[in-house]
Amino acid sequence: MHFSHDTQLTLRDACALVNSDRAHGRPLADQAALDAFLDIQGWTGRRDRDNAELAAVHALRDRLGAIWTAAGRGAGAEEDAVAAVNALLADTHAAPWLTRHPEMPQWHLHLASPEDPLAKRMGAEMAMALADLIRAGELRRLKTCAAPDCDAVLIDLSRNRSRMFCDTGNCGNRQHVAAYRERRRET
Protein backbone atom coordinates (compact mmCIF):
# COMPACT_ATOMS: atom_id res chain seq x y z
CA MET A 1 0.00 0.00 0.00
CA HIS A 2 1.37 3.36 -0.97
CA PHE A 3 0.76 6.31 1.32
CA SER A 4 1.72 9.88 0.52
CA HIS A 5 5.07 11.11 1.76
CA ASP A 6 3.57 13.41 4.39
CA THR A 7 1.28 10.64 5.66
CA GLN A 8 4.24 8.30 6.11
CA LEU A 9 6.26 10.98 7.91
CA THR A 10 3.37 11.81 10.21
CA LEU A 11 2.70 8.15 11.02
CA ARG A 12 6.38 7.78 11.94
CA ASP A 13 6.14 10.93 14.08
CA ALA A 14 3.08 9.54 15.87
CA CYS A 15 4.94 6.30 16.49
CA ALA A 16 7.97 8.19 17.85
CA LEU A 17 5.72 10.25 20.13
CA VAL A 18 4.03 7.15 21.58
CA ASN A 19 7.42 5.48 22.04
CA SER A 20 8.73 8.45 23.99
CA ASP A 21 6.90 6.96 26.97
CA ARG A 22 7.70 3.30 26.33
CA ALA A 23 10.63 0.89 26.54
CA HIS A 24 13.88 2.33 25.23
CA GLY A 25 12.15 5.65 24.48
CA ARG A 26 13.41 9.11 25.29
CA PRO A 27 10.89 10.48 27.79
CA LEU A 28 9.58 13.97 27.17
CA ALA A 29 10.11 14.91 30.80
CA ASP A 30 10.70 18.61 30.28
CA GLN A 31 10.54 21.36 27.70
CA ALA A 32 14.13 20.80 26.56
CA ALA A 33 13.34 17.15 25.79
CA LEU A 34 10.19 18.18 23.92
CA ASP A 35 12.14 20.78 21.92
CA ALA A 36 14.74 18.17 21.00
CA PHE A 37 12.01 15.74 19.94
CA LEU A 38 10.27 18.36 17.80
CA ASP A 39 13.55 19.37 16.16
CA ILE A 40 14.44 15.76 15.35
CA GLN A 41 10.97 15.10 13.93
CA GLY A 42 10.97 18.39 12.00
CA TRP A 43 7.89 20.03 13.53
CA THR A 44 7.65 23.73 12.77
CA GLY A 45 5.27 26.49 13.81
CA ARG A 46 4.27 27.97 17.12
CA ARG A 47 5.83 26.68 20.32
CA ASP A 48 4.78 28.13 23.66
CA ARG A 49 7.48 26.27 25.62
CA ASP A 50 5.47 26.09 28.83
CA ASN A 51 4.10 23.39 31.14
CA ALA A 52 0.65 23.55 29.58
CA GLU A 53 2.10 22.74 26.15
CA LEU A 54 4.12 19.85 27.56
CA ALA A 55 1.04 18.47 29.34
CA ALA A 56 -1.04 18.76 26.15
CA VAL A 57 1.59 16.81 24.18
CA HIS A 58 1.65 14.14 26.93
CA ALA A 59 -2.15 13.87 26.69
CA LEU A 60 -1.91 13.53 22.90
CA ARG A 61 0.72 10.81 23.33
CA ASP A 62 -1.66 8.88 25.60
CA ARG A 63 -4.51 9.18 23.09
CA LEU A 64 -2.30 7.94 20.26
CA GLY A 65 -1.06 5.06 22.41
CA ALA A 66 -4.68 4.03 22.96
CA ILE A 67 -5.18 3.90 19.18
CA TRP A 68 -2.18 1.55 18.81
CA THR A 69 -3.58 -0.57 21.64
CA ALA A 70 -6.99 -0.69 19.97
CA ALA A 71 -5.42 -1.71 16.65
CA GLY A 72 -3.84 -4.76 18.27
CA ARG A 73 -7.03 -6.08 19.83
CA GLY A 74 -8.51 -7.82 16.79
CA ALA A 75 -12.32 -7.91 16.85
CA GLY A 76 -13.79 -4.45 17.25
CA ALA A 77 -10.39 -2.81 16.85
CA GLU A 78 -11.34 -0.84 13.79
CA GLU A 79 -14.44 0.67 15.38
CA ASP A 80 -12.49 1.65 18.49
CA ALA A 81 -9.69 3.19 16.42
CA VAL A 82 -12.19 5.06 14.23
CA ALA A 83 -13.95 6.48 17.30
CA ALA A 84 -10.61 7.63 18.76
CA VAL A 85 -9.44 9.19 15.48
CA ASN A 86 -12.79 10.93 14.95
CA ALA A 87 -12.65 12.32 18.49
CA LEU A 88 -9.13 13.61 17.89
CA LEU A 89 -10.15 15.23 14.59
CA ALA A 90 -13.14 16.86 16.28
CA ASP A 91 -11.13 18.07 19.28
CA THR A 92 -8.48 19.66 17.06
CA HIS A 93 -11.02 21.25 14.68
CA ALA A 94 -8.94 19.94 11.77
CA ALA A 95 -9.35 22.08 8.64
CA PRO A 96 -7.28 20.79 5.70
CA TRP A 97 -5.38 23.11 3.38
CA LEU A 98 -2.64 22.52 0.82
CA THR A 99 0.75 24.04 1.47
CA ARG A 100 4.44 23.70 0.79
CA HIS A 101 7.44 25.21 2.52
CA PRO A 102 11.24 24.90 2.49
CA GLU A 103 11.22 21.92 4.87
CA MET A 104 8.84 20.02 2.56
CA PRO A 105 8.71 21.60 -0.91
CA GLN A 106 6.16 19.19 -2.41
CA TRP A 107 2.47 19.98 -1.95
CA HIS A 108 1.01 18.42 1.16
CA LEU A 109 -1.84 18.88 3.61
CA HIS A 110 -1.73 20.76 6.86
CA LEU A 111 -4.74 20.51 9.09
CA ALA A 112 -4.15 23.43 11.41
CA SER A 113 -2.54 26.83 11.19
CA PRO A 114 1.15 27.15 12.12
CA GLU A 115 -0.06 29.59 14.79
CA ASP A 116 -2.35 27.04 16.47
CA PRO A 117 -1.12 25.40 19.69
CA LEU A 118 1.43 22.64 19.16
CA ALA A 119 -0.65 19.73 20.48
CA LYS A 120 -3.59 20.81 18.32
CA ARG A 121 -1.41 20.86 15.19
CA MET A 122 0.24 17.56 16.01
CA GLY A 123 -3.07 15.94 16.91
CA ALA A 124 -4.79 17.08 13.73
CA GLU A 125 -1.93 15.93 11.48
CA MET A 126 -1.55 12.60 13.25
CA ALA A 127 -5.29 11.94 13.31
CA MET A 128 -5.52 12.57 9.57
CA ALA A 129 -2.59 10.24 8.87
CA LEU A 130 -4.30 7.57 10.96
CA ALA A 131 -7.55 8.25 9.09
CA ASP A 132 -5.71 7.62 5.80
CA LEU A 133 -4.44 4.33 7.20
CA ILE A 134 -7.92 3.27 8.32
CA ARG A 135 -9.55 4.33 5.02
CA ALA A 136 -7.04 2.15 3.18
CA GLY A 137 -8.00 -0.84 5.34
CA GLU A 138 -4.49 -0.96 6.79
CA LEU A 139 -5.06 -0.56 10.53
CA ARG A 140 -3.10 -3.78 11.10
CA ARG A 141 0.04 -1.82 10.17
CA LEU A 142 -0.09 -0.33 13.69
CA LYS A 143 1.80 -2.90 15.75
CA THR A 144 3.51 -3.45 19.06
CA CYS A 145 7.06 -4.79 19.04
CA ALA A 146 7.17 -8.60 19.03
CA ALA A 147 10.06 -8.74 21.52
CA PRO A 148 8.73 -10.07 24.83
CA ASP A 149 10.57 -7.42 26.86
CA CYS A 150 9.51 -4.42 24.76
CA ASP A 151 6.26 -2.47 24.67
CA ALA A 152 7.29 0.00 21.95
CA VAL A 153 4.97 0.52 19.00
CA LEU A 154 5.79 0.55 15.31
CA ILE A 155 4.23 1.50 12.02
CA ASP A 156 4.79 -1.27 9.49
CA LEU A 157 5.19 0.44 6.13
CA SER A 158 6.82 -2.61 4.53
CA ARG A 159 5.27 -3.88 1.33
CA ASN A 160 4.14 -7.19 2.81
CA ARG A 161 3.35 -6.03 6.36
CA SER A 162 6.11 -8.27 7.75
CA ARG A 163 7.83 -5.91 10.15
CA MET A 164 7.74 -7.28 13.70
CA PHE A 165 10.25 -5.30 15.74
CA CYS A 166 10.62 -1.65 16.73
CA ASP A 167 13.57 0.61 16.01
CA THR A 168 14.05 1.73 19.58
CA GLY A 169 16.09 -0.99 21.26
CA ASN A 170 17.73 -3.40 18.80
CA CYS A 171 14.90 -5.83 19.54
CA GLY A 172 15.02 -7.70 16.23
CA ASN A 173 18.72 -8.47 16.54
CA ARG A 174 18.35 -9.60 20.15
CA GLN A 175 15.49 -11.96 19.23
CA HIS A 176 17.36 -13.40 16.25
CA VAL A 177 20.50 -13.99 18.34
CA ALA A 178 18.43 -15.66 21.07
CA ALA A 179 16.76 -17.93 18.49
CA TYR A 180 20.15 -18.81 16.99
CA ARG A 181 21.58 -19.66 20.40
CA GLU A 182 18.54 -21.80 21.18
CA ARG A 183 18.97 -23.72 17.92
CA ARG A 184 22.67 -24.23 18.66
CA ARG A 185 21.87 -25.49 22.15
CA GLU A 186 19.43 -28.05 20.71
CA THR A 187 22.06 -29.59 18.40
Residue ranges: model-predicted function:
Residues 149-154, 170, 175:
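Cys/His-rich microdomains that often coordinate metals
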Residues 161-172:
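Cysteine-rich micro-motifs
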